[in-house]
Amino acid sequence: MKITVIGAGSWGTALALHFSQHGNRVSLWTRNADQVRQMQEARENKRGLPGFSFPETLEVCADLADALKDSGLVLIVTSVAGLRSSAELLKQYGAGHLPVLAACKGFEQDTGLLTFQVLKEVLPDNKKIGVLSGPSFAQELAKQLPCAVVLASENQEWIEELVPQLNTTVMRLYGSTDVIGVAVGGAVKNVMAIATGLSDGLEYGLNARAALVTRGLAEITRLASAMGAQPKTMMGLAGIGDLILTCTGALSRNRRVGLGLAEGKELHQVLVEIGHVSEGVSTIEEVFNTACKYQIDMPITQTLLQLIRKEMTPQQVVERLMERSARFE
């Protein structure tokens, strides 16, 4: 199958590498013309994922029309902020009918829409829209280390066709029709990873980390259920699986944000040092607004938002959570 990957960050590049190494032709495209030239010349993404050479089956395209030609699937792997404009480009290039998966995680700022909802709004006639989510770091996938992720869509027939087409010995795929649950799990776990990074950076120990992960899962489940998701989805790869990896893994950008804030650094300084997008930071406010809309109590999210707004110190965040009134779990 010909696959088009839009977005050449670390995750987009890792997915392009993976699928091109497992029987697919892949075209990789990004808006950044300088990055396109660099990748074409070096046959490697030295900016986003250095150290991994591109196989012959991976084509880097300067023209989106070339990238979309004969494509059977589009993966949009931009930041959430770039998702809508990428979907609009598909329409502009006459490719709005192509099957499309959002492989980014978060809520769109200002609208509060989940990734698949953005795609549905921009491409209302497209019946093959979904998300790819689950516990997976770009570096490990590029090294062909095993992982398992979820493909979710409201279109069950399409997912049943797509899963065996994309399933490999490196990336095991599971299908789901609970696209809300899969999308919410992927979005909100980034917020919880900032909290665990904060706790780890303050050296509060493994007990505190376990408590934050567990209560974070409770917050995610409450919100997802209120939005129409199946609670059992939160017990799977797109829920607790992604949460554990992002909250504990050394490669987690969002956890690194928490670690940096615990050191007393300004948020903008932390983000510059990381050098990549942290969806957790841009998602916090929309998660909190959505929780308010559904009248869901999300204390971890709320206190983190106060931290980002400089209304609390890192120490006060943890203290506030521990001082909450006693209650039954």
UniProtKB/Swiss-Prot annotation:
Any one of the GO BP annotations: carbohydrate metabolic process
Chief localization: cytoplasm
Pathway where this protein functions: Membrane lipid metabolism; glycerophospholipid metabolism
Record carries keyword NAD: yes
Recorded superkingdom: Bacteria
InterPro entries: 6-PGluconate_DH-like_C_sf, 6PGD_dom2, G3P_DH_NAD-dep, G3P_DH_NAD-dep_C, G3P_DH_NAD-dep_N, NAD(P)-bd_dom_sf
Catalytic activity line of the entry: sn-glycerol 3-phosphate + NAD(+) = dihydroxyacetone phosphate + NADH + H(+); sn-glycerol 3-phosphate + NADP(+) = dihydroxyacetone phosphate + NADPH + H(+)
Gene Ontology cellular component list: cytosol
Keywords in alphabetical order: Cytoplasm, Lipid biosynthesis, Lipid metabolism, NAD, NADP, Nucleotide-binding, Oxidoreductase, Phospholipid biosynthesis, Phospholipid metabolism
Enzyme class: oxidoreductase
GO molecular function, one term: glycerol-3-phosphate dehydrogenase [NAD(P)+] activity
Task performed by this protein: Catalyzes the reduction of the glycolytic intermediate dihydroxyacetone phosphate (DHAP) to sn-glycerol 3-phosphate (G3P), the key precursor for phospholipid synthesis.
Active site (UniProt): 189 (proton acceptor)
Family: Belongs to the NAD-dependent glycerol-3-phosphate dehydrogenase family.
EC number annotated for this UniProt entry: 1.1.1.94
Compartmental location: Cytoplasm
Protein name: Glycerol-3-phosphate dehydrogenase [NAD(P)+]
Residues holding sn-glycerol 3-phosphate: 105, 134, 136, 189, 242, 252-254
Sequence positions that bind NADPH: 10-11, 31, 105, 138, 253, 277, 279
